[in-house]
Each structure stands twice: as C-alpha cells, then as structure tokens.
Curated annotation (Swiss-Prot):
Protein name: Imidazole glycerol phosphate synthase subunit HisH
Superkingdom of origin: Bacteria
NCBIfam families for this protein: IMP_synth_hisH
UniProt organism field: Salinibacter ruber (strain DSM 13855 / M31)
Assigned GO CC terms: cytoplasm
GO biological process: L-histidine biosynthetic process
Family matches, as PROSITE patterns: GATASE_TYPE_1 (PS51273)
Length: 218
C-alpha cells in the first residue's frame, strides 16, 4: 500500500491516479497514526516552501513522517515535497525544513547570478535527468529520460552522494535525490508520461526496507 500524505495543499488526485495507472494500491490520509505506520509514503507539494511546512506542522505530521522514515519506509517527496526534505528553504525568508537531507533550497537566480536572461524562471517544461549512478528507482527509464518540471527553486545538496540525477538549466541542480529509503524528485512524475509512470512503478516495487548501507538520521 502506498500512502499519500494529505496536508491540505495541492491537487492530490493527479499523483494518486498516476500510481493507480501503474497498478499500485494507493490511498490518501492526513491521520498522523496512519502515516507513522504506513508501508510506503509519498509527500507531494506545490506552491511555497513555508506554506507547505507550516501546514505539515500545524497538522502534527512532522513527527510521524520522521518515525516512518526511521523505520525504513520507502519515502518519496515530489516537487516541493522533495524540497521539504532539506534543512532550510529560502523562499521569501528562511524556513526550517524536515532536515532529513543536508542542504538548502534556493532560487535559480540566487544560485547563479550569471544565468542567461533568455532562460526564464520558473523552469517550466521538459528537460533531461542525468543519472549519477544506477538505482532501481531509475530502472528501464533510459539513459537520459525527459521529465516535466515547473519550479523556481531547487535544492542545493551538501552531500554529493545524495544526488541520484542532475539536470541542467543555466547550471546543474539535483533533480532526483536518494539516501537509503528516502527519495525526492524535483519534477512532476504524474505529468512526465512514460518516464514518470516508470519511476512511480519502480518506487511502488521497492522493498519496504532499503539495504542502501547508509543511515538516515531523523
């Protein structure tokens, strides 16, 4: 069972439908106990970093999220949900994230002052993801699959080992991150056609406990 965390922000039906398309059993919940005990978790996210993390905390979901990650539950953050995995977000201020992965989230033009003007922000549309290593999450997606992005901010990972794929847009940024049982994708898999569905199918097939050899500190 794949559980989608419902914290009241965004249209969750699209990601839910994408999982159903690949044959996964999926449901949504905002119940802290159900999240803490889930077999597999997805944290979607759209909009502003602060609004998302504030709502997660208002609903007392941060603790259950950490509990589930600590149990080895496969966990996937999508778009802003991926950004929330990092320590700090700098969208309209400085905001504390979930702190699962070391690093921060910054605006494209703040991380690259020399970014060409013809590259508009937000980064919107299809772009390639370049794997840094093999992983079951990326199985059968092709050497450089194209996926769909809509974002103005991106993570800056402190640990290069956490970066599973990179994407170039003015500069190179992490587009998929992974540490043990924790995964994050900056793009929208539910909008990324075959590559996106393939990634969700791979995630749904991951074992409950990842044998990655690195421990996530929560």
């Amino acid at each position: 069972m794949t559980t989608i965390i419902d914290y009241g922000i965004g249209n969750l039906r699209s990601i839910e439908k994408a999982f159903e398309t690949v044959g996964a059993t999926v449901h949504r919940t905002d119940d802290p106990a159900a999240i803490a005990e889930a077999e597999r978790l997805v944290l979607p996210g759209v909009g502003a970093f602060r609004a998302c993390i504030d709502e997660i905390r208002r609903r007392d979901l941060e603790g259950p999220i950490h509990d589930a990650i600590g149990r080895g539950v496969p966990f996937l953050g999508v778009c802003v949900g991926m950004q929330l995995l990092f320590e700090t977000g700098y969208e309209k201020g400085e905001h504390e994230g979930l702190g699962v992965l070391p690093g921060h989230v910054a605006h494209f033009r703040e991380t690259d002052a020399g970014m060409p003007d013809e590259l508009t922000v937000p980064h919107m549309g299809w772009n390639a993801i370049e794997p840094t290593r093999d992983h079951p999450l990326l199985d059968e997606l092709g050497a450089t699959p194209y996926v769909y992005f809509v974002h103005s901010y991106h993570p800056v990972a402190e640990d290069a080992d956490d970066v599973l794929t990179t994407t170039s847009y003015g500069h190179t940024f992490p587009s998929v991150v992974q540490r043990d049982n924790v995964f994050g994708v900056q793009f929208h898999p539910e909008k990324s056609q075959a590559a996106g569905l393939g990634l969700l199918d791979n995630f749904a097939a991951l074992p409950t406990t990842e044998e990655a050899g690195r421990t996530v500190s929560t």
